[in-house]
Regions:
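Acidic donor-binding loop at a coil-to-helix junction in glycosyltransferase catalytic cores
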Residues: 121-127
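Short aromatic/hydrophobic "clamp" motif used to bind/position activated sugar donors
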Residues: 43
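Acidic helix N-cap motif at the loop->helix transition within catalytic regions
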Residues: 7-16, 55
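A recurrent flexible, glycine/aromatic-enriched loop bordering the glycosyltransferase active site
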Residues: 68-78, 87-108
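A conserved acidic beta->alpha catalytic loop
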Residues: 2-10, 50
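Glycine-rich, basic loop-to-helix element that forms the pyrophosphate-binding segment
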Residues: 12, 22-38
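Conserved donor NDP-sugar-binding/catalytic core segment of glycosyltransferases
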Residues: 54-81
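Hydrophobic helical membrane-anchoring modules
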Residues: 129-187
């Protein structure tokens, strides 16, 4: 699924033999479209700049034998010590997971919570929070690696402050449309 990226990701995927479906609009629309087109009983939502670790498939299958869904821990593709541990700190202090953690779910649980809501921002946070309320959420001990481009481009402290502010405002009921203007996409 490609939500309208302009960085050549879709073309790279095509040249590697992948079927690329473009779903213009928000990431939530792309993930919903992907889930509708998927034929399996398990769904894994992987961002284009995130890499799964060895053994990911087996770990997901084992977790999903118990139903529900889950996610991986995250590390950033940056050698700076603080960024290497930021994923664990983010998880510990912010709680719910985000899309760069390769969220996975059974189709039954996906349908039970109504899938992704068509939000312009916080769609992964919202999805994972609702999934956790089903009582069947697994945080795997394996790490995915994701791009730290926003941290490199805007600075880590600025990025963290913006993320925490947006999450706090979202939890306080501020409209996702308004929040999206504060956190432009990096594609």
């Amino acid at each position: 699924m490609d939500a309208g990226s302009d960085d050549g990701t879709g073309e790279a995927a095509r040249s590697a033999g992948a079927r690329v479906i473009v779903a213009p609009g928000s990431r939530a629309v792309a993930m919903t479209t992907g889930a509708l087109l998927a034929r399996g009983d398990a769904l894994l939502f992987l961002h284009a700049d995130t890499t799964l670790p060895a053994g990911a498939g087996d770990a997901v299958r084992q977790a999903l034998e118990h139903g529900g869904g889950g996610a991986f821990r995250v590390r950033y593709d940056d050698g700076r010590p603080f960024l290497r541990t930021l994923g664990d700190l983010r998880l510990r202090f912010l709680g719910p997971v985000y899309g760069d953690q390769a969220i996975f779910v059974t189709r039954a649980a996906y349908d039970q919570i109504g899938g992704y809501r068509p939000l312009p921002i916080m769609e992964d946070y919202d999805f994972a929070r609702r999934l956790r309320h089903t009582g069947r959420f697994f945080l795997l001990p394996l790490y995915v690696e994701t791009a730290a481009r926003r941290h490199r481009g805007h600075g880590t402290l600025s990025t963290l402050a913006r993320m925490w502010t947006i999450q706090g405002l979202y939890r306080a009921g501020v409209s996702p449309d308004r929040l999206a203007r504060m956190y432009p996409p990096t594609r």
